[in-house]
Amino acid sequence: MSTTLLQSDLPGLPLRHRGKVRDVFDLPRDRLPADAPPGDYLLMVATDRLSAFDVVLPDPIPGKGEMLCQVSNFWFHKTEHLMPNHLMDIRVEQVLPEGVDPALYAKRAVVTRKLKPVPVEAIARGYVIGSGWKDYQRTGKISGIELPDGLRQAEKLPEPIFTPSTKAAVGDHDENIDFDAMVKTVGAELAERVRDATLRIYRFAADFAAERGILLADTKFEFGTDADGRLYIMDEMLTPDSSRYWPADQYEPGTSPPSYDKQFVRDYLETLDWGKTAPGPRLPADVIDRTRAKYAEALQRLADISVD
């Protein structure tokens, strides 16, 4: 069984950001191998924290960070021919401070290049579900994109669509925006590059997942640029936290299909008298165990990686 990590503390490494799930540290040059290419680097740690309704919950999911990191790394390498990514070929053990147990971080941390984040979430949707379903019911559109009349919940769209959203701070909510609003935020040229890369990767990943009996309903990417303006995909990639995966044999349009994610947690929280603001409630052991099992099943089916 993996060691549970709720929060990473690495003496001597400046904490750059603590998000809902990931802790990000700056890597001083003296922590890097002598042969590391020029540039600035980060250490990104996937903890076992779990968020729901934009609130970080007090109970972790044991091993979740390791599973998320392994899924991301699988997809980063699988899609290298489509898009460069932020990963650097430097082992985590080489940069950890003295006295820190490498076994705790080896499977949940990566060394990455430091990039300038594109300040928009890049979302690809192949099915009408979630916030997209709510928008469609209200307006017949998602992010300003006109869709056919009469679509049912979870129905497959004629073509995948790009639906950007704002990138909210921890505790705030992302808001769907249309492409014109994204252009005003980042410029037309960068917006088009992000849109094209998002849809290209989504189509590839959806085809790959379908071969393994999984439907990729939608996913969220984050992109960043280097000093030369080169675009990279960064943060996490096609994990159960950032994507909606459905077992193909249980898919039925007009319903809300079961998914390989934290739906057990959301369903449980919906039964509580809780205002969906911090602090979040404690989770029962069976909800934690069932959620962990879903993450493990996704890792096994997609990447053929088993966990204890």
Curated annotation (Swiss-Prot):
Catalytic activity from the UniProt record: 5-amino-1-(5-phospho-D-ribosyl)imidazole-4-carboxylate + L-aspartate + ATP = (2S)-2-[5-amino-1-(5-phospho-beta-D-ribosyl)imidazole-4-carboxamido]succinate + ADP + phosphate + 2 H(+)
Keyword hit for ATP-binding: yes
The family this protein is said to belong to: Belongs to the SAICAR synthetase family.
Pfam families: SAICAR_synt
MF-aspect GO terms: ATP binding; phosphoribosylaminoimidazolesuccinocarboxamide synthase activity
First-tier enzyme category under EC: ligase
Metabolic or biological pathway: Purine metabolism; IMP biosynthesis via de novo pathway; 5-amino-1-(5-phospho-D-ribosyl)imidazole-4-carboxamide from 5-amino-1-(5-phospho-D-ribosyl)imidazole-4-carboxylate: step 1/2
GO cellular component term of the entry, any: cytoplasm
Keywords recorded for this protein, A-Z: ATP-binding, Ligase, Nucleotide-binding, Purine biosynthesis
Known EC number: 6.3.2.6
NCBIfam families in the record: PRK13961.1 (NF010568), purC (TIGR00081)
Name listed for the protein in its UniProt record: Phosphoribosylaminoimidazole-succinocarboxamide synthase
UniProt KW ATP-binding keyword: yes
GO biological process: 'de novo' IMP biosynthetic process
Encoding gene (name): purC
CDD domains: SAICAR_synt_Sc
